[in-house]
C-alpha cells in the first residue's frame, strides 16, 4: 500500500483488528521510507454500485458521502458513533443486497430517512430538510405533523408525572 505521507510503495502492517461490528478490518501500517504510521480500513464490497442522479448522470456509489450525511444529521445528538457506523453499514448492506447495480439517489435518500426516523427524530428532520430542500417553514410543520411519536421519545410528561406524591 502506498504511504499517504511520502508516496512510497513499501509499507508494513503492524497490527490488524476486526471492527466491533465485524464488517471491516482496521490495519495499523508503517512506511519503511519515512516511518510515518497510518491506519487503513478494509471492507467487503459485495458489488459495484452506481448512483443515478436526478438529472440522469451516473456516478459511483460513495459510502463515505452517505456516512458524512448521516453524521451531519446526527451531530450533537445522543447517538454513539458505533451506532452511527452500524446504521451506515446497514444502509450499505441493504443497497448491496437489493440485487441492483444502479440505484437512484432518491432510493438512497429514502432509505436514509427511514433509518434516521427510527434512530432519532431530530436527525430525521434535519436530514429530510436538506434532502428535500425545504425552503419554507410550512415544509417543516408538515413533516413534524406527519411524524408519529416513537414510544419512549416524548418530551411531554404523562398525567402521572405531574401529580405530586403525598
Swiss-Prot record:
It comes from Gluconobacter oxydans (strain 621H) (Gluconobacter suboxydans). The keyword Ion transport does not apply. Residues 49-139 form the ATP-cone domain. The gene is nrdR. This is Transcriptional repressor NrdR. Its cofactor is Zn(2+). Binds 1 zinc ion. Residues 146-166 are annotated as: Disordered. Negatively regulates transcription of bacterial ribonucleotide reductase nrd genes and operons by binding to NrdR-boxes. Belongs to the NrdR family. A zinc finger (unnamed) spans 3-34. Keywords: ATP-binding, DNA-binding, Metal-binding, Nucleotide-binding, Repressor, Transcription, Transcription regulation, Zinc, Zinc-finger. InterPro entries: ATP-cone_dom, NrdR-like_N, RNR_NrdR-like. Coiled coil: none annotated. GO terms for molecular function: ATP binding; DNA binding; zinc ion binding.
Amino acid at each position: 500500500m502506498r504511504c499517504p505521507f511520502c508516496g512510497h510503495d513499501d509499507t508494513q502492517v503492524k497490527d490488524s483488528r476486526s471492527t466491533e461490528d465485524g464488517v471491516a478490518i482496521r490495519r495499523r501500517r508503517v512506511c519503511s521510507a519515512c516511518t510515518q504510521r497510518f491506519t487503513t480500513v478494509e471492507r467487503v464490497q459485495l458489488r459495484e454500485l452506481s448512483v443515478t442522479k436526478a438529472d440522469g448522470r451516473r456516478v459511483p456509489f460513495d459510502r463515505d458521502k452517505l456516512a458524512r450525511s448521516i453524521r451531519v444529521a446526527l451531530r450533537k445528538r445522543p447517538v454513539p458513533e458505533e451506532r452511527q457506523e452500524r446504521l451506515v453499514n446497514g444502509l450499505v448492506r441493504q443497497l448491496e443486497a437489493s440485487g441492483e447495480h444502479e440505484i437512484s439517489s432518491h432510493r438512497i435518500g429514502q432509505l436514509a430517512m427511514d433509518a434516521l426516523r427510527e434512530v432519532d427524530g431530530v436527525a430525521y428532520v434535519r436530514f429530510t430538510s436538506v434532502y428535500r430542500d425545504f425552503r419554507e417553514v410550512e415544509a417543516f410543520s408538515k413533516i413534524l405533523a406527519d411524524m408519529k411519536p416513537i414510544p419512549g421519545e416524548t418530551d411531554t410528561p404523562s398525567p402521572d408525572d405531574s401529580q405530586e406524591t403525598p
